[in-house]
């Protein structure tokens, strides 16, 4: 089945598959032996004939192509080949936060703080410079590359920050258990929407357990009203940051930090008590696994 020719790309193997898209390791081949490895994400053929879906995919891909930040995996191209729409993006060898938590368990306080700080850097750029919210900040969309950098991936469902005067309903996209109430209800999206997702992600990173994710959309929404896990009971070193994280996942958007940078400042203050060093350097074995078979 592989390799497959797909326009100017050679698809080497499938990396992931979901309800909307398939993701492939690919090679771009040019003159005199030039080769570049990257990732190609194709929307499923049955969705390529859905005009509304294609329009949204193209609009979102145009947003992603414009993003340029050290903590965001860049998208190189939006295209269509044989009637199939796709985006090509940088190949970052490393592990997702989901893989790290599965393989080695929860992060320690310093590691989690560093991950949170770098995610917030990416989001602050998206919010301030591009006026968009990510809408899907989850452990599977956070990548730790082999150089130790934290990279935010998949701005595929990013959306413009919603005006405070807007009464238009926003389409509900995102991952159950990582969306705040206003996102679930299709209401106004602001930077505080992503701040909630970062707070939920950090709780999971430090405890190994997602605070709100359950087996269904409805159960995940109901879990928002359940008591939060106690970070201080998980690790007493987390006590100084526990209150800030509780604010980040407040059900009312107005009660959260209103900017990603505001949360990052608190995380930087918290992290000053620890030795410096990124997660990959603190856990060298994480650097040996990437997209290679």
Predicted regions: what is each one?
Residues 115-116:
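Activation segment signature within eukaryotic-like protein kinase domains
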Residues 177-278:
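C-terminal lobe helix-coil module of Hanks-type protein kinase domains
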Residues 121-132:
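Protein kinase catalytic-loop region centered on the HRD/HxD motif
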Residues 22:
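Conserved N-lobe ATP-binding subsite of Hanks-type protein kinase domains
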């Amino acid at each position: 089945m592989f390799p497959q020719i797909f326009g100017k790309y050679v698809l080497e193997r499938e990396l992931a598959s979901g309800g909307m898209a398939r993701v492939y390791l690919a090679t771009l081949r040019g003159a005199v032996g030039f080769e570049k490895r990257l990732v190609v994400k194709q929307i499923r053929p049955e969705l390529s004939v859905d005009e509304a879906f294609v329009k949204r995919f193209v609009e979102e891909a145009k947003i992603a192509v414009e993003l340029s930040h050290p903590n965001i995996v860049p998208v190189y191209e939006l295209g269509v080949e044989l009637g199939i729409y796709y985006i090509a993006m940088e190949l970052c060898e490393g592990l997702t936060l989901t893989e790290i938590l599965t393989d080695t368990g929860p992060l320690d306080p310093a590691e989690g703080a560093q991950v949170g700080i770098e995610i917030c850097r990416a989001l602050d750029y998206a919010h301030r410079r591009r006026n968009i919210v990510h809408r899907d900040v989850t452990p599977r969309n956070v990548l730790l590359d082999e150089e130790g950098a934290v990279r935010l991936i998949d701005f595929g469902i990013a959306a413009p920050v919603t005006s405070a005067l807007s009464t238009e309903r926003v389409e509900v996209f995102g991952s159950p258990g990582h969306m705040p109430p206003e996102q679930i209800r299709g209401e106004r999206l602001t930077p505080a929407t992503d701040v909630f997702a970062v707070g939920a992600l950090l709780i999971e990173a430090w405890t190994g357990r997602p605070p709100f994710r359950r087996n269904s959309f409805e159960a995940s929404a109901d879990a928002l009203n359940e008591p939060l896990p106690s970070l201080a009971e998980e690790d007493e070193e987390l006590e100084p940051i526990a209150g800030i994280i509780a604010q980040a996942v407040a059900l009312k958007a107005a009660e959260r930090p209103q900017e990603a940078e505001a949360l990052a400042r608190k995380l930087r203050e918290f992290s000053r008590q620890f030795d410096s060093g990124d997660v990959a350097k603190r856990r060298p074995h994480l650097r040996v696994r990437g997209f290679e078979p």
